Amino acid sequence: MQVKLFYTLALWAPILVSAQLSGSVGPLVDFKTKAKNKTCDITDYGAVADGKTDVGPAILDAWGNCSTGGLIYVPPGTYSLATDLELKHGESTAFQLDGVLARGHEGSYQLILVRNCHDCEFFSGNSQGAVQGYGYEYLQDGNYGERLFRFQDVSDFSVHGFAAIDSPAYYLVFDTVSNGEIYNLLVRGIADLGMTDAFDIWGQNVWVHDIEVTNGDECVTVKSPASDFLIENIYCNLSGGTAIGSLGTGTNISNIHYRNLYMNQADACYLKTHNGDGIVKNIVWENVIVHRGPYPLAVNEAWGKDVGSTGVQVQNLTFRNWYGENTANSRPAIRIECDEDVPCYDITLDNVNLWTEDGDYVEWSCANAYGSGACLQEAKDTGDLATYTTAVTVTATPSYSATHMPGDFTTNPPSTAPFTIPPMPTSFYPGATPISTLLSLSGAGGL
């Protein structure tokens, strides 16, 4: 159901849901209306929930008949998916995944591609749907397979209510999307290998909320170009954490609001680039809890491969109400290191309380960054900013209490066996229930 931002939003979300959104998000027509119009049950097209028979042809046939104005239904059960799916040119359509799609072949690119879809919804009606990637078959040997999902050129959409399990590579990529809502999702996989990003998103006007991630790389990451994102109630539970980047040439990111972030052995902010170009501006991170993050708060403009351009202009970043600790005080708890040719400015640290579980001091590191808080220098004139580098050692322990989530992992999941599909979480931030209630439908569209 589309969320209208001019409502009081009592039925949908907190009043401040529009913090960085520029308009309405979500499908224009609800899934029940689509199901009433036309329903395509994949078992009517030859699908068998035996975990062996390839369900791909049945899904493609159902999509062909219901991708305009209808609902494609995957009933409960386990289905083998041995065909890469390209679900394209959907118009006012819904895909209800109440069963499990288990990867059944060795593909090389994308297991499920949803492309050029308008007014579409990909969801689980019983909150038990899942895609099982069996990624351990690759990752235990240091190899990679295909990605689970890619949503490309999708508008007025929602994705919600299911689990993405043990991907052989990336999990969910949202490529050039707009007016979308992404929520009530669980990612669970091997937590010690990179190139396993959970959510990579770029586009315009997107609301991401109530997400839990366990993986070996980035948790919820904004890529360029992106504008008008609200990202809240995020639980990175053994993960790289929430990031911006990495950023190359032509960067254009603005009006991104992260709030209510809970990090267990993950980082809440890692903005990374190395001699790219373009701009990052108007970004907020607030209400953040970090436990054992390697780099809890980091802006690093010398990260990775040198792209060879003039540097990304970073401006107007706000970090507000942060609590927690890093893993080792040999790494700065606060690191804001900007390009000497394009210094950062208008950076604000407000009530940021970061300590360490390793020792009796923390380091702050700042370079070519201007604003207020920590080791930042103040700027009288942003038109002429000098270069500088400074490090501060802090020995005074901040006074704060940072709660823990009961589901925090303390050890990495095994990497040599299939994952059991867990139930959908009922909380993604301490003391908070999901903004949108988990669905418990019986049958297609809940009819």
Curated annotation (Swiss-Prot):
Residues 1-19 form the signal peptide. Keywords: Carbohydrate metabolism, Cell wall biogenesis/degradation, Disulfide bond, Glycoprotein, Glycosidase, Hydrolase, Polysaccharide degradation, Secreted, Signal. InterPro entries: Glyco_hydro_28, Pectin_lyas_fold, Pectin_lyase_fold/virulence, RHGA/B-epi-like_pectate_lyase. Coiled coil: none annotated. Gene3D superfamilies: Single-stranded right-handed beta-helix, Pectin lyase-like. The active site is at D217 (proton donor), H291. GO terms for biological process: cell wall organization; polysaccharide catabolic process. Disulfide bonds join C40-C66, C219-C236, C338-C344, C366-C375. It comes from the Eukaryota. It is an enzyme of class 3 (hydrolase). Pfam families: Glyco_hydro_28, Pect-lyase_RHGA_epim. One of its GO terms (molecular function) is polygalacturonase activity. The keyword Cell wall biogenesis/degradation applies. Glycans are attached at N37, N65, N237, N252, N316. It is found in: Secreted. Its EC number is 3.2.1.-. One of its GO terms (cellular component) is extracellular region. Belongs to the glycosyl hydrolase 28 family. Pectinolytic enzymes consist of four classes of enzymes: pectine lyase, polygalacturonase, pectin methylesterase and rhamnogalacturonase. Hydrolyzes alpha-D-galacturonopyranosyl-(1,2)-alpha-L-rhamnopyranosyl linkages in the backbone of the hairy regions of pectins. This is Probable rhamnogalacturonase C.
